[in-house]
Design a protein with these regions (language model features):
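Nucleotide and nucleotide-moiety/phosphate-recognizing core
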Residues: 2-8, 12-88, 93, 102-103, ...
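Flexible, gly/pro- and Lys/Arg-enriched active-site loops
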Residues: 38, 46, 53, 71, ...
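Redox- and metal-dependent alpha/beta enzyme cores, enriched for Fe-S-associated oxidoreductases
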Residues: 162-176
């Protein structure tokens, strides 16, 4: 049976009780077995849509459902627990994300696996590393524990790619005052990862029309494609909140 890992989150109502009920419901499903769960950890919210802290955790499932069928089960369980999908990063009683489904890589209209943000979000990686430390991330080709450890290295090296040096400098100026502990730089200015020491923690590709750099040219582990987002500053702040402002 395939091994799957899911993330649990919530900040409305009795979240611990909601987690317990959700896991009980999953374990009662004839095609789902809950193998192991992490500790629950309290984390700061991302964005400014809510100020209430979240409870987060992870669970290891053994299933005989397809990825798409499992997603539907998770979404139905969220709805049954009162989840309403209206505001991104908003308050919610229960959030269930499918992180990994064996070593499958899925890119469909309704489902992306591995979860595209699971490799750099501390509120996902910390609990997930408790129960899946040696599991290989199928895209990054390194373990969950190693992905988490990369985020702990100081100074935190954050590289912007896919912008002209002038565009990158303006964006860095906007970001530096908010995150003075982060070392920001431009890929186009540096020239390559070899000139950035230590290895960048994250390389965010913004894919401006003026860029001569392709996303596929960037190092595999730290690269993150944000080219589809309109507000670069806001999106990068959300990424940094997820990677840095853990608790």
């Amino acid at each position: 049976m395939p091994d799957c890992y899911i993330a649990l989150g919530g900040n409305q109502g009795p979240v611990r009780e909601t987690f317990s009920l959700a896991l009980e419901r999953l374990d009662q499903h004839p095609d789902i077995s809950v193998i192991k769960t992490s500790h629950w950890i309290e984390t700061a919210p991302v964005g400014d849509q809510t100020t209430d802290p979240f409870l987060n955790g992870a669970a290891h499932l053994s299933i005989s459902l397809s990825p798409e069928s499992l997603l539907l089960e998770l979404q139905q369980l969220e709805a049954d627990m009162g989840r309403v999908r209206e505001i991104r990063w908003g308050a919610r009683p229960l959030d269930l994300d499918l992180l990994l489904y064996d070593q499958l890589i899925i890119r469909s209209q309704n489902l992306v696996v591995p979860h595209p943000a699971c490799w750099y979000r501390r509120f996902v990686l910390d609990p997930l590393s408790e129960i899946a430390a040696d599991v290989i991330h199928p895209e990054k080709q390194t373990t969950i524990q190693e992905l988490r450890q990369r985020l702990l290295i100081k100074p935190f090296q954050f590289v912007l790619a896919g912008l002209s040096p002038k565009e990158a400098a303006l964006l860095i100026e906007n970001l530096q005052h908010k995150y003075p502990e982060v070392q920001f730089s431009s890929w186009e200015t540096q020239g390559s990862a070899a000139s950035i020491t230590p290895e960048p923690t994250l390389i965010v590709w913004l894919g401006a029309p003026s860029s001569t750099i392709k996303f596929e040219d960037l190092p595999l582990i730290p690269r993150l494609d944000l080219s589809d987002y309109q507000n670069n500053t806001e999106r990068i702040v959300h990424v940094l909140q997820s990677a840095l402002d853990f608790q």
